[in-house]
Amino acid sequence: MPTTILIVEDEFLIAVEIEAVVHDLGHESAGIADDMESALAKASEAIDVALVDVNLADGATGPRIGEKLAADFGIEVIFVTTNPAQLGEGVSGTLGALEKPVDLSILKQVLDYVIAVRKGEKIDPPARLRLFFN
């Protein structure tokens, strides 16, 4: 059964590229959101993973979006951002952060890891994924 992934990214070309990679890896896209309102409108318990940028069309709302997606919908959240330092020690309930740019092989490793974690499996995280311990 494919994993359903929500992409929260305000730069259209980056969002479309990530969505293409998601499809190429055999997963389903729950759509693209570019701000808090659209992300929460698309959110549901049917979504497994969210890839969330920090700085969006409505400002630096990514951390609040990620926290809400994790707490309210049980979605595994990975931040994909050019500036992971903005996340400090991490965001409650979320898994971690991946620094842009991200290529196909790295995104595949991260998604494989997140899917394994969601299933309760214990595997080592990819080297580029900075995990939050919260």
PLM features: residue spans?
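Conserved phosphotransfer microenvironments
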Residues: 52-70
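Acidic, metal-coordinating helix/loop segments flanking the phosphotransfer/catalytic sites
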Residues: 19, 32-49
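Hydrophobic/aromatic residues positioned on beta-strands within the core alpha/beta folds
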Residues: 80-81
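A Lys-centered signature of the CheY-like receiver
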Residues: 100
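CheY-like receiver
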Residues: 109, 118-134
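Conserved acidic carboxylate
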Residues: 9
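Charged phosphotransfer/docking patches of two-component systems
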Residues: 12-16
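Short hydrophobic helical patches associated with two-component signaling proteins
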Residues: 17-22, 107
